[in-house]
Amino acid sequence: MSYFDPETNEKITPTVIEPAGGLTRTLFALLCSCYDEEEVNDTTRTLFRFDFNIAPIQIGILPLSKKDELIEVSNNIKNILQENYRTEIDVTQSIGKRYRRQDEIGTPYCITVDFDSLEKNTVTVRDRDTMEQETIPIDDLSKKYSEFE
């Protein structure tokens, strides 16, 4: 596409430069770069590998069952952690399905509250990326996550 300028006797081809940027493109790029699928035990595990600081939910709290004692400990942990972190308590379905659901929404860490939490005052912390689990005292939870701030 060009035109002829009769005043200068030149053929001109216009150039269009459209610099565009926006939140939508940035967000889409982030989602694409964090999306991952991997094979685990003959099934496909879908997850978002969000950095701890930008994850919509930073720490998922998963009581092993709906027993009142475990829910109470879970709520106490949430009250401690929600001052500095985005947390969510999930009590629906089996623990394995809850782990998968938290992986799919990009939650970097899940805390499992089980009967050892009642007896020994400990919880199991699971890392989304490595799927490794460690047992730590409930009193050490704030210290564990402070390294990500």
Role assignments for model-derived ranges:
Residues M1-E149:
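NTP/phosphate- and nucleic-acid-binding module
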